[in-house]
UniProtKB/Swiss-Prot annotation:
InterPro entries: DAACS (IPR050746), Na-dicarboxylate_symporter (IPR001991), Na-dicarboxylate_symporter_CS (IPR018107), Na:dicarbo_symporter_sf (IPR036458)
Predominant place of localization: membrane
Record's protein name: Excitatory amino acid transporter 4
Naturally occurring in which organism (per UniProt): Canis lupus familiaris (Dog)
Positions contributing to L-aspartate binding: 388-390, 427, 468-472, 501, 508
Lineage: Eukaryota, Metazoa, Chordata, Craniata, Vertebrata
Amino acid sequence: MSSHGNSLFLRESGQRLGRVGWLQRLQESLQQRALRTRLRLQTMTREHVLRFLRRNAFILLTVSAVVIGVSLAFALRPYQLTYRQIKYFSFPGELLMRMLQMLVLPLIVSSLVTGMASLDNKATGRMGMRAAVYYMVTTVIAVFIGILMVTIIHPGKGSKEGLHREGRIETIPTADAFMDLVRNMFPPNLVEACFKQFKTQYSTRLVTRTIVRTENGSELGTSMPPPSSMDNGTSLLENVTWALGTLQEVLSFEETVPVPGSANGINALGLVVFSVAFGLVIGGVKHKGRVLRDFFDSLNEAIMRMVGIIIWYAPVGILFLIAGKILEMEDMAVLGGQLGMYTLTVIVGLFLHAGGVLPLIYFLITHRNPFPFIGGVLQALITAMGTSSSSATLPITFRCLEEGLGVDRRITRFVLPVGATVNMDGTALYEALAAIFIAQVNNYELNLGQITTISITATAASVGAAGIPQAGLVTMVIVLTSVGLPTEDITLIIAVDWFLDRLRTMTNVLGDSIGAAVIEHLSQRELELQEAELTLPSLGKPYKPLMAQEKGASRGRGGNESAM
């Protein structure tokens, strides 16, 4: 008995000492960091300042562009510019969007093909499974945060009569929307997939139906006479009697039928599916696919060189994009009342997910400080805020992760294009939150089953968003239809969607970036084995470009991201 008591006492003492030791180590680490910062400030010279400015020129210019753009927009609002004048003013920003969108298509295809071809099937399968688990977990958490925030804050309290409606929403049946998603995964024409997506359209046709009624009002449904008897005279008499005792009624009505159609825009989902399959096949044929492998690798390098040129224009474009959007707002007063509370709820939810959940996942898996990493992708985040498209931000995200943070290119070339297409944490959070907000303004009480339906539908619908601007409004129709909420009430939140769209795009891009770092950390063993195999003399040459990493950037990331 005494030995058992002593063991319990020793175990509790050990746990207490462990907790004290952890706190002490954390305190010592913070003190050492503060001391290093103090020494760095004391020994700072003009040369150090210039080196810092050169190293962070992109980020400083981009942040300055955002501040100047917002200030310039509010300074010009009193002049009440016309729509044409605002479009002229926003023209430099439109040029940036067109430049980035020009690079999206070749970048997605070349990066996915080279990334898949550089890994064997077993390593690709494991990486794909980890990416799928990460995407699903973060999306489900985002939906849960959105539901929790809108339930706690309850921004829809009151009547919707005071809310301003704006725009029109096309109603799309849920089944047709999901079938379009699957259809777009397998485009019949790859050339057409570069500029068009399949989208179900609807037409009406006139249907005529003849209804036969008897004297007592019963419906026979057809105008055929009763069967004839053996006696011709009796048969004729019965037919005359039947005709006199019946009434034919012709009904005509219009029926809405689905027909094949299309919508302008890159079919990113179909190109991703094809590129992944094509890259796996090239990797499987080994030496026979060397020419194709080298071609797509050279194409990817050329595209990244073009990104390096365009990136210097990004601050100018972002300045005019943000300023133009603020100038387009007709009335800033729409941000008050219920809509203001709704906007605040979305911002809080996105902040909790992007500033809390995603960094926590990064820290728990990699055991590194997540905030230097987030600082490394800051330019991609600001670009996402300006363009409101995770696909258009993809070239900048590649540059930040590969050249700035030294993430393995075999990981980024697989994770980033797929993530920009299907991993939409911010969109999923927004859709779940907005659906419950619309239920609240209609005084509609949702039960647990309906909230669960919203969660599942928002998670699935976010996959089909495909990184296009304001896709959340389109997929929102699916979520509302699943629980019978009025889809026309989406017009209540359109007035602030341009702003919230930028914030959720930033969340999407951050989720993709952290996902790439997490999957790289979990795939270290496969990457090292693959590198050892590919450095053999018989296989070395074709794969060397893929294994060339930015050593300086990698060392910078290792020095900055020290464990907390």
